[in-house]
Amino acid sequence: MKRVMFHAKIHRATVTQADLHYVGSVTVDQDLLDAAGILPFEQVDIYDITNGARLTTYALPGERGSGVIGINGAAAHLVKPGDLVILVAYGVFDEEEARNLKPTVVLVDERNRILEVRKG
């Protein structure tokens, strides 16, 4: 059996921009993507801590060291600059992979600088 499991998370990031007229996605500082192990164009869920909104989109790489978390397209109606969010990526794993999975959690400060990277 295959299982859908969370494998990476960027926790309590602050949204820095929103562009309603961009063609979808979330732009994320490449340093954060690398730390979490999230690839460009990988599907991610966004959980808005501030207002409870939840949505699915894909990650686009942003400028390294910029701290950018940019909500693009229609999602800009739901998630606003200044909101705290959690970005989560899931993968499909077989039983053994799922049981041995050690998800990556990236904790950031209010400027989206990496504070800590946790495995498992």
UniProtKB/Swiss-Prot annotation:
GO terms for cellular component: cytosol. InterPro entries: Asp_de-COase-like_dom_sf, Asp_decarbox. Keywords: Autocatalytic cleavage, Cytoplasm, Decarboxylase, Lyase, Pantothenate biosynthesis, Pyruvate, Schiff base, Zymogen. Pfam families: Asp_decarbox (PF02261). One of its GO terms (biological process) is pantothenate biosynthetic process. The active site is at S25 (schiff-base intermediate with substrate), Y58 (proton donor). Substrate binds at T57, G73, A74, A75. The keyword Lyase applies. It is an enzyme of class 4 (lyase). One of its GO terms (molecular function) is aspartate 1-decarboxylase activity. Is synthesized initially as an inactive proenzyme, which is activated by self-cleavage at a specific serine bond to produce a beta-subunit with a hydroxyl group at its C-terminus and an alpha-subunit with a pyruvoyl group at its N-terminus. HAMAP family: PanD. NCBIfam families: panD (TIGR00223). Catalyzes the pyruvoyl-dependent decarboxylation of aspartate to produce beta-alanine. PANTHER family: ASPARTATE 1-DECARBOXYLASE. This is Aspartate 1-decarboxylase. The lineage of its organism: Bacteria, Thermotogati, Deinococcota, Deinococci, Thermales.
